[in-house]
Amino acid sequence: MAKRVAIVGAGVSGLASIKCCLEEGLEPTCFERSDDLGGLWRFTEHVEEGRASLYKSVVSNSCKEMSCYSDFPFPEDYPNYVPNSQFLEYLKMYANRFSLLKCIRFKTKVCKVTKCPDFTVTGQWEVVTQHEGKQESAIFDAVMVCTGFLTNPHLPLDCFPGINTFKGQYFHSRQYKHPDIFKDKRVLVIGMGNSGTDIAVETSRLAKKVFLSTTGGAWVMSRVFDSGYPWDMVFMTRFQNMFRNSLPTPIVTWLMARKMNSWFNHANYGLVPEDRTQLREPVLNDELPGCIITGKVLIKPSIKEVKENSVVFNNTPKEEPIDIIVFATGYTFAFPFLDETVVKVENGQASLYKYIFPVHLPKPTLAVIGLIKPLGSMIPTGETQARWAVRVLKGINKLPPQSAMTEEVNARKENKPSGFGLCYCKALQSDYITYIDELLTNINAKPNLFSLLLTDPRLALTIFFGPCTPYQFRLTGPGKWKGARNAILTQWDRTFKVTKTRIVQESPTPFASLLKLLSLLALLMAIFLIFL
């Protein structure tokens, strides 16, 4: 009899988990507390409890070729950066294509997940759910938690002296939907992540004045990168990743700063990060520099004091009149349906091996999918996690001894720099390609560049020097997709299809053959260094 797997949440990771279970012959049941799939990507006019919330104008920060499921490309006529409404349609197409809807129970809240009395023998879980006010209990052989980390707003009011005296309006960015409420108002946005920056820029079109307060600064990138290419298709390549990871961290940090400043000098705009030794997730926004240079958005330091109708910033004695404060101060994550002994969260970190498995369980039958912030797209990350996790749940792949897993988790929490490559500032951040390759290696699905160079050199060159698109993860191993090679070789065609809407006659490039030869030599040298 097939193992029964309970999946909590029908967002991008939940859908991938359902599909992976079906591919491995398991019996998944997905519980979704809302009335539709999509999680974060389903816009609603009102905030729903226990579900991520987005604003009407949200567009993906990762382009369609980099953020699709590995065996299901976005439609070629979709824009490279996808608005939330089209992203939701894509998720629905994915669910229909692989018959996932039959496994989802909508309007069903997971109340409690507990180990069965004989857990040490069976590894089973009791899952208590609630549908239309009625509670039910069922036994499952495994559980996959796919609830994400954008549901519990972090609102540190204690850090803002005088906030209780403020007579204006204030709220967390989770509540933001449209900019209309800011018309002719003086607005302060606290926090310079992607949401805070988006809200400040969007608000500046209607507001009287907009301040964006940041404590540590941030690198700001445009989605439009070198030569007009999508940023992640240029930045996320195996060649660049190997190059960065082979250099000392100070050199990589200097190169990163130089690249970030090639768009505009961050110091001249008051944005340069105070701590440049550790990489904080860059902010993706195409308009912020223009808003700053035209005076629509003013960058300010942290808040010293909030008064009845104004605020005082640190190092600036002048009071600034404020009508509305938006706290874009991020989120905390928790698992209210799980006992703390199962997944313990301390200081914003969970003791999960490879960000997936609790290290102390005698039976590895619970997996957390999507609780990670890679410098890359979440969909292929969560999908690859699910592919490996399902094979562990099924017993095909084995985990290391508990001592080895604990040692790795503790090392990650300490976040000690290795001295090479990028050093990330948060425990939930990771090197996208390195992390994906670790998981692919566990299921024997990592592409073998040396072998491909001998049998399919065109594909090998594209994989190594081109963008690390998710199709690479389906070239071999379990779940191999016969369309992967073609998807890789045509990825730029789909990218340009929606931008080249006016055909221009191009002159031939005289050095094209030379560049190809140099690329081949560089690949051979890289492979030589790898196997040295």
Swiss-Prot record:
Site (Important for substrate binding): 208
Cofactor(s) recorded in Swiss-Prot or TrEMBL: FAD
Location relative to the cell: Endoplasmic reticulum membrane
Single GO BP term: taurine biosynthetic process
Residues that coordinate or bind FAD: 9-13, 32, 40-41, 61-62
Keywords: Acetylation, Endoplasmic reticulum, FAD, Flavoprotein, Membrane, Monooxygenase, NADP, Oxidoreductase, Transmembrane, Transmembrane helix
One MF annotation (Gene Ontology) recorded for this entry: N,N-dimethylaniline monooxygenase activity
Membrane topology field: Single-pass membrane protein
Residue ranges that the UniProt entry lists as topological domain Cytoplasmic: 532
Lumenal topological domain residue ranges: 2-510
UniProt keyword Membrane present: yes
One GO CC annotation: endoplasmic reticulum membrane
Top-level enzyme category: oxidoreductase
Enzyme Commission number(s) of this protein: 1.14.13.148, 1.14.13.8
Superkingdom of the organism of origin: Eukaryota
Catalysed reaction, written as an equation: hypotaurine + NADPH + O2 + H(+) = taurine + NADP(+) + H2O; hypotaurine + NADH + O2 + H(+) = taurine + NAD(+) + H2O; trimethylamine + NADPH + O2 = trimethylamine N-oxide + NADP(+) + H2O; N,N-dimethylaniline + NADPH + O2 + H(+) = N,N-dimethylaniline N-oxide + NADP(+) + H2O
PANTHER family, sorted: DIMETHYLANILINE MONOOXYGENASE (PTHR23023)
Role, per record: Broad spectrum monooxygenase that catalyzes the oxygenation of a wide variety of nitrogen- and sulfur-containing compounds including xenobiotics. Catalyzes the S-oxygenation of hypotaurine to produce taurine, an organic osmolyte involved in cell volume regulation as well as a variety of cytoprotective and developmental processes.
Similarity comment: Belongs to the FMO family.
Protein name: Flavin-containing monooxygenase 1
Lineage, opening ranks: Eukaryota, Metazoa, Chordata, Craniata, Vertebrata
